[in-house]
Amino acid sequence: MQPIRVVLAGATGKVGQVLARALVQEPGFALTGAIARQGGGRNLAELVPLGGRPGPTVHGSLEEFLAAGGEADVLVDFSVAEAGRRTIPAAIEASIAPVVGTTGFQPGETETWAAMCRKRGLGGAFIANYAVGIMLLMRFAEEAHRFFPDVEIIEMHHKTKLDAPSGTALRTKARLERGRGDLAAAEVPVHSVRLPGLVAHQEVIFGGLGQTLTIRHDAPSREAYVPGVLMTCRWVLREKRVAFDLEEVAFPRT
């Protein structure tokens, strides 16, 4: 069986480095390309510790990667929104399925790319958070909201995170607001914290008569995203469908 060929955008970023190490070690995967703003022409292993394994050549853009004869089945994009706006549609046009963890896009952008995927018969994923624990937090919170109408979200991240509120918090908020059925939920407040020493943390706090309930997820290591990304890469190639939530991948509806 041929390995899944991955080109990784944002390969030298904080999450990208973790994913690069995972992809060069994971059976059934081959990291065939790396895209980064700096280090073009160098081997990724010179820029990112890959555990002694060789890496692909770094390119400044997906177009450069393809022009150099690069081939990939999946684009994994954990870059920034500005770069993603160029890389993601280029990948789809090249029949490379996008698995996107980059956030900060304007409303409607991911829907446009999803439509492009469907038109070309490609799978794709535009998911704000690939941590399996966050997926379960949303699932549990949606269930709890049936019994606790009063709820607020607190999301806490490292000081350099660009978007606030986080894409994950906004996704959680949207699920809670639409998940109450006929109970007409009010808008769910979201509070953002950006401090040194934090990595990625989210709490959903419910209040009721004489009690509170807190559902919390902590990701002190960016390795938390690896299992979800690998699972989604397999899914987009197998199912050739588009997902906006990791739950759609982990718990597919027939």
Swiss-Prot record:
CDD domains: DHDPR_N. One of its GO terms (molecular function) is NADP binding. Keywords: Amino-acid biosynthesis, Cytoplasm, Diaminopimelate biosynthesis, Lysine biosynthesis, NAD, NADP, Oxidoreductase. SUPFAM superfamilies: Glyceraldehyde-3-phosphate dehydrogenase-like, C-terminal domain (SSF55347), NAD(P)-binding Rossmann-fold domains (SSF51735). GO terms for cellular component: cytosol. NAD(+) binds at residues 10-15, 101-103. Its EC number is 1.17.1.8. (S)-2,3,4,5-tetrahydrodipicolinate binds at residues 158, 167-168. Disulfide bonds: none annotated. GO terms for biological process: diaminopimelate biosynthetic process; lysine biosynthetic process via diaminopimelate. It catalyses: (S)-2,3,4,5-tetrahydrodipicolinate + NAD(+) + H2O = (2S,4S)-4-hydroxy-2,3,4,5-tetrahydrodipicolinate + NADH + H(+); (S)-2,3,4,5-tetrahydrodipicolinate + NADP(+) + H2O = (2S,4S)-4-hydroxy-2,3,4,5-tetrahydrodipicolinate + NADPH + H(+). It is found in: Cytoplasm. InterPro entries: DapB_C, DapB_N, DapB_N_CS, DHDPR_bac, NAD(P)-bd_dom_sf. The active site is at 157 (proton donor/acceptor), 161 (proton donor). Pathway: Amino-acid biosynthesis; L-lysine biosynthesis via DAP pathway; (S)-tetrahydrodipicolinate from L-aspartate: step 4/4. PROSITE patterns: DAPB. Catalyzes the conversion of 4-hydroxy-tetrahydrodipicolinate (HTPA) to tetrahydrodipicolinate. Belongs to the DapB family. This is 4-hydroxy-tetrahydrodipicolinate reductase. The gene is dapB.
